[in-house]
Amino acid sequence: MGVALRPLLAEYKESPGWDGLGGIAAVDAFNALYQFLSGIRQADGAPLMDGQGRITSHLSGLLFRNANLIEKNITPIYVFDGKPPVFKASTLSKRREVRENAADAWEKALKEGDEESARKYAMASSKIDAFIIDSSKELLSALGIAWIQAPEEGEAQSSFMTKNGDVTYAVSQDYDSLLFGAPDLVRNITVSGKKRIRGKVLSVYPERLRLEEVLTGLSVTQEELIQIALLIGTDYNSGVPGVGPKTAVKIVREGKFYDRIGESENAAEPDQLIGYFMDPPVERSYNIESRSPDPDRVIDLLCGEHGFTQERVEAGLERLGAKKGQATLDAWF
């Protein structure tokens, strides 16, 4: 997901360590939920499920990853996507096709007894539906963790809140937040700390990117960074064939963006896409106040409705409660 800016950003990444990340984090909810749904699975790739066959991997992730964040003096605020912009339709269609193909491959691998392939394809088949969204919001409310409904893109909303000074930084695995103007982006704090790549398990550490340092280092403006992304390709356009990150920077610096962007097949005019990144629809009135968890409500939801063991849930609640009072909004202003 997101734009392929990684090669241009490597030298601007900071490794702050957990001690340097205390504050209020505007978390891209869908991004985090996909991580939970893909990563929290059984050996054969099957997600955690309750007695009614409803997926619960995301609920486990929300309880224990948030406990981890709060123990590290990070106050998470979850921002949910709203209606996608019309020019994202092609990308969403392709993602659905990828998930469907992965689901078929998962089933085939299971029949063949190939557990490693089954898990890989199962992770790629993850999807977010109305139940996942509604149950996530319900659990977050019970945990006392604020959540916000964005009118369209969650990353745009998170970026707006960061620019506004209401949160310390935006959290997402994608780099789109920089295009939306987030002055501070943090990656890898809602993941488990381990990542499997080509069969190897690697450690994952927090990364931080500051927009001002990126723009200064690349000698571009915010609008020019967006132009670079459009030349490469984003969730909203296909990019120019044969143009990679370094070539895109060269084109923009030479003032030839409009000469080359016409070579791509786009559903929207480049100025419309630039305008969307610069001034996206956002909710300007929101409440990010965190509260103490409601243990009875959490236990009723997770244990009563979804079959979690009470001992496990109480352990998560204890971790949340132990630090909750230290991670309120007042601590950061």
Curated annotation (Swiss-Prot):
<feature type="region of interest" description="N-domain">
    <location>
        <begin position="1"/>
        <end position="99"/>
    </location>
</feature>
<keyword id="KW-0235">DNA replication</keyword>
<keyword id="KW-0255">Endonuclease</keyword>
<protein>
    <recommendedName>
        <fullName>Flap endonuclease 1</fullName>
        <ecNumber>3.1.-.-</ecNumber>
    </recommendedName>
</protein>
<keyword id="KW-0460">Magnesium</keyword>
<keyword id="KW-0378">Hydrolase</keyword>
<dbReference type="InterPro" id="IPR006086">
    <property type="entry name" value="XPG-I_dom"/>
</dbReference>
<dbReference type="InterPro" id="IPR036279">
    <property type="entry name" value="5-3_exonuclease_C_sf"/>
</dbReference>
<feature type="binding site">
    <location>
        <position position="153"/>
    </location>
    <ligand>
        <name>Mg(2+) 1</name>
    </ligand>
</feature>
<dbReference type="InterPro" id="IPR006084">
    <property type="entry name" value="XPG/Rad2"/>
</dbReference>
<comment type="subunit">
    <text>Interacts with PCNA. PCNA stimulates the nuclease activity without altering cleavage specificity.</text>
</comment>
<feature type="binding site">
    <location>
        <position position="174"/>
    </location>
    <ligand>
        <name>Mg(2+) 2</name>
    </ligand>
</feature>
<dbReference type="InterPro" id="IPR006085">
    <property type="entry name" value="XPG_DNA_repair_N"/>
</dbReference>
<keyword id="KW-0540">Nuclease</keyword>
<feature type="binding site">
    <location>
        <position position="28"/>
    </location>
    <ligand>
        <name>Mg(2+) 1</name>
    </ligand>
</feature>
<dbReference type="GO" id="GO:0003677">
    <property type="term" value="F:DNA binding"/>
</dbReference>
<dbReference type="InterPro" id="IPR019973">
    <property type="entry name" value="Flap_endonuc_arc"/>
</dbReference>
<feature type="region of interest" description="Interaction with PCNA">
    <location>
        <begin position="325"/>
        <end position="333"/>
    </location>
</feature>
<feature type="binding site">
    <location>
        <position position="176"/>
    </location>
    <ligand>
        <name>Mg(2+) 2</name>
    </ligand>
</feature>
<dbReference type="Pfam" id="PF00867">
    <property type="entry name" value="XPG_I"/>
</dbReference>
<dbReference type="GO" id="GO:0043137">
    <property type="term" value="P:DNA replication, removal of RNA primer"/>
</dbReference>
<feature type="binding site">
    <location>
        <position position="81"/>
    </location>
    <ligand>
        <name>Mg(2+) 1</name>
    </ligand>
</feature>
<feature type="binding site">
    <location>
        <position position="235"/>
    </location>
    <ligand>
        <name>Mg(2+) 2</name>
    </ligand>
</feature>
<dbReference type="GO" id="GO:0006281">
    <property type="term" value="P:DNA repair"/>
</dbReference>
<dbReference type="InterPro" id="IPR019974">
    <property type="entry name" value="XPG_CS"/>
</dbReference>
<keyword id="KW-0479">Metal-binding</keyword>
<dbReference type="GO" id="GO:0017108">
    <property type="term" value="F:5'-flap endonuclease activity"/>
</dbReference>
<keyword id="KW-0269">Exonuclease</keyword>
<feature type="region of interest" description="I-domain">
    <location>
        <begin position="117"/>
        <end position="256"/>
    </location>
</feature>
<dbReference type="InterPro" id="IPR008918">
    <property type="entry name" value="HhH2"/>
</dbReference>
<keyword id="KW-0227">DNA damage</keyword>
<dbReference type="GO" id="GO:0000287">
    <property type="term" value="F:magnesium ion binding"/>
</dbReference>
<comment type="function">
    <text>Structure-specific nuclease with 5'-flap endonuclease and 5'-3' exonuclease activities involved in DNA replication and repair. During DNA replication, cleaves the 5'-overhanging flap structure that is generated by displacement synthesis when DNA polymerase encounters the 5'-end of a downstream Okazaki fragment. Binds the unpaired 3'-DNA end and kinks the DNA to facilitate 5' cleavage specificity. Cleaves one nucleotide into the double-stranded DNA from the junction in flap DNA, leaving a nick for ligation. Also involved in the base excision repair (BER) pathway.</text>
</comment>
<dbReference type="Pfam" id="PF00752">
    <property type="entry name" value="XPG_N"/>
</dbReference>
<dbReference type="GO" id="GO:0008409">
    <property type="term" value="F:5'-3' exonuclease activity"/>
</dbReference>
<feature type="binding site">
    <location>
        <position position="155"/>
    </location>
    <ligand>
        <name>Mg(2+) 1</name>
    </ligand>
</feature>
<dbReference type="InterPro" id="IPR029060">
    <property type="entry name" value="PIN-like_dom_sf"/>
</dbReference>
<comment type="similarity">
    <text>Belongs to the XPG/RAD2 endonuclease family. FEN1 subfamily.</text>
</comment>
<dbReference type="InterPro" id="IPR023426">
    <property type="entry name" value="Flap_endonuc"/>
</dbReference>
<keyword id="KW-0234">DNA repair</keyword>
